[in-house]
Amino acid sequence: MRAPALLLALFLAGNALADGVDVGKPSSVRNLVPAGVLERQAQQEYDQLKRQAAAKRALGPDDHPQVRRLRAIAARMIPFVDRFNPRARQWQWEVNLIGSRQINAFCMPGGKIAVYTGILDTLKLTDDEVAIVMGHEIAHALREHARERAAKSQLTQLGANVLGELVGGGRYAGALQLGGSPLSLPFSRD
């Protein structure tokens, strides 16, 4: 009797683990900002970042060993992104290396990834460690955290404007927006 129960428990536990960790449903508030609009804005910002880095000779060239390394690591992860965001399979993924002592990496909406040399040089990351950092940053884009922040910011501004009109005919809208800004701070915990 104990063996079948143990086998059933192992089977159920294995099934749960095989599907990964449930991270919950994304906030529906993000739907207030069209994904395509945010992705186009991110593309423009990313292109500007690349131009600025290139002007400073800080954009890693395509044949740079670290650029090839980063792109190879990303190429192993990108085929699995649609599991978390079906639209991500249409994204035009880009991975670039920025020469800077900053210890940083990010992934913008639409799959625009940048890794700073500072994080690689200072921390001496292995490929697996780079994949962890990159995967974390990709998860922000897949979960559309920037889109959610933009929507919350719009709601805060709208609420401040409405309250400002009700309270003082619009005279206090600016102050109310400032007071509401902590509600929409990036990286806030919900």
Name every feature range the model reports, one short phrase each:
Residues 4-15:
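Bacterial N-terminal signal peptides
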Residues 15-190:
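A Zn2+-metalloprotease active-site environment signal
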